[in-house]
Design a protein with these regions (language model features):
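Post-cleavage N-terminal segment of exported redox proteins
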Residues: 3-40, 52-55, 60-65, 184-197
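Electrostatic cytochrome c docking/interface patches
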Residues: 28-48, 64, 68-83
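C-type cytochrome heme-c attachment and multiheme electron-transfer modules
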Residues: 43, 52, 105-197
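Processing junctions and N-termini across compartments
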Residues: 48, 85-88, 130
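The canonical Cys-X-X-Cys-His
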Residues: 52-61, 88-99
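Histidine-centered active-site/metal-ligand motif
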Residues: 58, 71-75, 81, 95, ...
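Short, solvent-exposed loop/turn and secondary-structure capping segments
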Residues: 59, 66-70, 103-107
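A short acidic, glycine/proline-enriched capping/turn motif at secondary-structure boundaries
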Residues: 98-101, 115
Length: 197
């Protein structure tokens, strides 16, 4: 037998053993505990998104909501095509680039360095009244979320407008789940493949 044939037979035997060994190993799967943890993480995310601070700019209709009770915004304010309000009644007409000083009182319009706005008319991302499953699916749907993948959505969570939910100014309830816990839950859910309940 030539040396080349011998080497080929040894290599073939080695590959066969390797394939047989690999076939006996348990496949790597996301077990129920991983999925359960991801779904628990999403529930934390859901609680934040369905808090009034987030829902008020993510209603089902075109009128933003306001207040801790989520009532329809006064002055017949409307979303507008770009989410910044209608001509002559744009969000920034009343909402400045920062929360006003507390001495101004409890009912002064809040502000954000990013500029106040809602999602655009053709990319409504609705948080109000959505079931956990529907909310989860919609968040990941680029037709509704501004064309963002999970990494871009995570970046969005660091914008001044989103951060505002944890420091909404005098007379407004902040998001009840600490921001660090929310971000950790988002990241755990995303790492697990963002499963939906």
């Amino acid at each position: 037998m030539s040396a080349m044939v011998s080497r080929f037979m040894i290599l073939s035997a080695f590959v066969s053993l390797l394939v047989a060994w690999a076939g006996k190993r348990a496949p790597v799967t996301r077990g129920p505990s991983v999925n359960a943890r991801a779904l628990a993480a999403f529930d934390t995310v859901r609680q934040v998104l369905q808090h009034p601070r987030c829902q008020n700019c993510h209603p089902g209709g075109d009128a933003p909501l306001q207040g801790d009770d989520g009532h329809v915004h006064t002055q017949n304010v409307q979303r507008g095509t770009d989410g910044r309000g209608e001509i002559g009644e744009q969000c920034t007409t009343c909402h400045g680039l920062a929360n006003p000083p507390s001495g101004y009182g409890a009912h002064v319009p809040p502000g954000s360095a990013e500029g106040w706005r809602m999602p655009a008319e053709d990319e409504k991302l609705v948080f109000v009244g959505m079931s956990p499953h529907a909310l989860c699916e919609q968040i990941k749907d680029r037709r509704h979320n501004g064309g963002k993948d999970m990494a871009a959505l995570r970046d969005h969570l660091d914008t001044p407008l989103v951060r505002w939910g944890w420091s909404p100014g005098i007379g407004r309830q902040s998001v009840s789940i600490p921001r660090a816990r929310f971000l950790a839950a988002w990241e755990a859910w995303a790492r697990a493949g963002a499963p939906c309940p």
